[in-house]
Amino acid sequence: MKRNFPKLIALSLIFSLSITPIANAESNSNIKAKDKRHVQVNVEDKSVPTDVRNLAQKDYLSYVTSLDKIYNKEKASYTLGEPFKIYKFNKKSDGNYYFPVLNTEGNIDYIVTISPKVTKDSSSSSKYTINVSSFLSKALNEYKDQQITILTNSKGYYVVTQNHKAKLVLKTPRLEDKKAKKTESIPTGNNVTQLKQKASVTMPTSQFKSNNYTYNEQYVNKLENFKIRETQGNNGWCAGYTMSALLNATYNTNKYHAEAVMRFLHPNLQGQQFQFTGLTPREMIYFGQTQGRSPQLLNRMTTYNEVDNLTKNNKGIAILGSRVESRNGMHAGHAMAVVGNAKLNNGQEVIIIWNPWDNGFMTQDAKNNVIPVSNGDHYQWYSSIYGY
């Protein structure tokens, strides 16, 4: 027995070492067997710069917790799935890195979008910006145990499955030009299959982290009663949606609607002239005055402290943005609403924004005046109208 004892120890060590990775993988994922059917997204290259990956891993939980508190969600645990990329119809990446945020059921709750900074970005602490929103999370959850490619054009975002069927899963209200309508088509066969690598976006890449402490300690301030009651379609009424949302919140009512606001201000327009009309800052201020408010124009982005004070005092803020990519077209200018603000665990200050195109909110660095939006464009926050 004594002579065999060392052999038994060696065998037990070999056995324990051989099963350790599997055991750790199971404990790290913490997902039931029925939920282990992963969504696989085709990518040309799975590589992600180290500083991009580190930024996502370091900050995602604080960003997610700020949105959880805005949505009045309960405390939860999250981890990141494998990052993926989105491609344009010419098969070139849109330039962003997308990190899915997984809950313990194996579903995607949020998307962390990390983008290279654009020229007009006012902050300078990093080469990248980080924003968190729901974005494509709901759509991706519908493709468990499937291999897909995500493509984008001026109409929105498409999921292309292995049988080469494409579905528009997220529309953007931006109008494409007539030439684009004639020439753009859904890539098939050879186009899609050239993306050889696969990102398992619902597969946990690290242990789940509870946001219990972050939830209790993190400061979040929301404009009371702010709700998403309607979203912008194929029209130029972003300012109408923005003012309606802010006034519904500050008056705690449901009576304001974008179309009615636009009709009030442009009663003589009909057809496409009415559908694609927009508003000037002067018209936005005038409408606020007719509703018992005293809106003020500020020719810059509001600071974090200004947002904090105005939001606490139930005064809504409209964002006026100018598109960085192009000054032409209906959406060259765009209005959005400030929902609130938060201070993350690392001390970073963020502003919570609602884009009328979206069904959810997004985070924005309070020192960054360039806002990435859900159609891939960027808007420079050049002015604010506060006091709705």
From Swiss-Prot:
InterPro entries, alphabetized: Cystatin_sf, Papain-like_cys_pep_sf, Pept_his_AS, Peptidase_C47, Staphopain_pro, Staphopain_pro_sf
SUPFAM superfamilies xref list: Cystatin/monellin, Cysteine proteinases
Keywords of this entry: Hydrolase, Protease, Secreted, Signal, Thiol protease, Virulence, Zymogen
Residues that make up the propeptide removed upon maturation: 26-214
Broad class of the protein's primary localization: secreted
Localization, UniProt: Secreted
Regulation: Prematurely activated/folded staphopain A is inhibited by staphostatin A (ScpB), which is probably required to protect staphylococcal cytoplasmic proteins from degradation by ScpA.
Biological processes per GO annotation: proteolysis
Annotated catalysed reactions: Broad endopeptidase action on proteins including elastin, but rather limited hydrolysis of small-molecule substrates. Assays are conveniently made with hemoglobin, casein or Z-Phe-Arg-NHMec as substrate
Record site: Cleavage: 214-215
Annotated GO CC locations: extracellular region
Enzyme class: hydrolase
GO MF annotation, one: cysteine-type peptidase activity
Modification after translation (UniProt): Cleavage leads to the activation of ScpA probably by an auto-catalytic manner.
Superkingdom of source: Bacteria
First and last residue of the signal peptide: 1-25
Enzyme active site: 238, 334, 355
Description of how the protein assembles with itself and partners: In the cytoplasm, prematurely activated/folded ScpA forms a stable non-covalent complex with ScpB.
Note: The catalytic maturation of ScpA appears to reside outside the cascade of activation started by the metalloprotease aureolysin (aur).
Protein purpose: Cysteine protease that plays an important role in the inhibition of host innate immune response. Cleaves host elastins found in connective tissues, pulmonary surfactant protein A in the lungs, and the chemokine receptor CXCR2 on leukocytes. Proteolytic cleavage of surfactant protein A impairs bacterial phagocytosis by neutrophils while CXCR2 degradation blocks neutrophil activation and chemotaxis. Additionally, promotes vascular leakage by activating the plasma kallikerin/kinin system, resulting in hypotension.
The protein's name in its UniProt record: Staphopain A
Gene: sspP
